Amino acid sequence: MKENKNSPEYPRTKLLPGVLFIVLLIILDQITKIVAVHFLGGGQNVILIPGVLEFTLIHNSGAAFGILQNAMLFFFIITAAALVMIFFILSRTPSARRYLPMRLCLYFIAAGAVGNLIDRAVFSYVRDFIYFSLIDFPVFNVADIYITCAAFTMVLLTMFYYREENDFSFLSFK
């Protein structure tokens, strides 16, 4: 029989270190946006790798690819729901080293969500500034990188690392 990850041998994750890490990530995101506004605010682009990567500032009042323009209430509700879910999962996650990758992914997703939420609350748009011109990808920011990379990593972890039947038993209400 496998050990129960809800048992006392698996103490819960302490939230304070994670919250401090999230705050640090949010600060980093906001600093990059401030720097982008300072250097790109006049409409100029900075080409880092010609035909591949450049910095260009846009004000995005929607989501990726320009969808959901000016849907502020929707973004606030979705972000709040995501943060509640993330902190619920974190509060129940065992502190075992095995769950560190999952915790880190959740920290990055939370930081990205809050970073963009701050922009929406303060400016009514998100400050995006990283542009991959090679594939004409939508302009994005550091918070978007946090969310995308962490979500992709979570999918991989779920597929290849957390494969045992009881790996997520700590989320059960039993």
Regions of interest found by a model, annotated:
Residues 1-174:
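Alpha-helical transmembrane bundles and membrane-interface segments of multipass inner-membrane proteins
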